[in-house]
Each structure stands twice: as C-alpha cells, then as structure tokens.
C-alpha cells in the first residue's frame, strides 16, 4: 500500500505529510472524535470508482456528530463532495480504497468540550485481501461490550474503539 499524495483537512486538500492535528486538542487527548470508514471499489469495465453506501455512512456520520453535541456539523453532502475531490486530487485508479472521514474537536479543553470542530478525510489504496477468496476462521469472544448506558456505543466515536 503506497502513501497517498494528499489528504483533506477542513475542506482543503493538503500534502499528506501536512495533515496534522495538534497534540493538545481534545480530539487527540480524549478521543473526542467520530468517524466513518468506508470503501471505494474500482470498476475497471467503467473506469470509475464506486463509493459503497456513501449516503448511509454520511447519515450515521451526521448522527454521531449530533449525539456528541459538536458545536458545528459537517453535513453528509459536503463531506461526500470533499471526499470525491480528494479521490480526484490523488488520481486513484485501478485499486480499491479505504476512506476515513473524521470530525474531531480541534480545540483544547477537557473531555466535555464540544468545539471548535475539524474535519479530516483520508483515502488510501487497499487491495482486496486474499482472505476474501480463501476465507477466514472466527470465534465468539467471551469479552462483554461496554453497555450503551456507560458510553455511547451507537456512535462511531474514536474513544469507543478502545473497548473492543
């Protein structure tokens, strides 16, 4: 997997190495961020990238931001447009993509701070895994998930992913 040339920060295309978040931000320190990870599938017959269930992902992205009571929201239509711009800027062609949209508290403060909010979008080539054709083994874990009344598990919040 090669490193892309560009990422998107707050709607601006920036060089990959300049896509940074301050270490004192609440998003970095406390995981006060929400995200959607989605896939782009290259169709060689049509020479086009197809984004998998983008509308559904963006609905959940908006819901997650509202649930976290962020001071401002990045709406799905805007994030979709910025994602397409990023894909075009990187000139991705021929490979499937893993795309990550993240809204995060970019300001400093404690765990309860709700703004200001930043937006990052990254897209990286991710070829289809051999496991798709070869299969995998799985098991049921004995670990219990954190209950919804302890943390907002219905939201794709970065902090939730420390809990399995």
Model-identified regions with their sequence ranges:
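Short, glycine/charge-rich beta-strand/loop segments that flank catalytic centers
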Residues: 75-86, 94-109
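Cytochrome P450 catalytic-domain "roof"
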Residues: 91
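Helix-start/capping segments and mature chain N-termini
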Residues: 1-71, 81-85, 110-164
């Amino acid at each position: 997997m090669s490193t892309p040339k560009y990422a998107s920060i707050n709607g601006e295309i920036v060089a990959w190495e300049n896509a940074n978040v301050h270490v004192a931000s609440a998003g970095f320190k406390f995981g006060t961020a929400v995200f959607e990870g989605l896939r782009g599938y290259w169709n060689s017959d049509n020479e086009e990238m197809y984004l998998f269930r983008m509308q559904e992902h963006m609905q959940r992205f908006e819901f997650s931001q509202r649930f976290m009571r962020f001071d401002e929201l990045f709406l799905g239509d805007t994030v979709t447009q910025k994602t397409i711009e990023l894909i075009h800027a990187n000139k991705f062609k021929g490979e499937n993509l893993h795309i990550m949209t993240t809204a995060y508290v970019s300001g400093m403060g404690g765990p309860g701070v709700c703004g200001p909010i930043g937006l990052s979008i990254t897209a990286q080539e991710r070829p289809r895994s051999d496991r798709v054709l070869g299969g995998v083994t799985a098991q049921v874990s004995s670990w219990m998930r954190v209950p919804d009344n302890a943390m907002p598990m219905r939201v794709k919040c970065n902090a939730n992913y420390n809990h399995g």
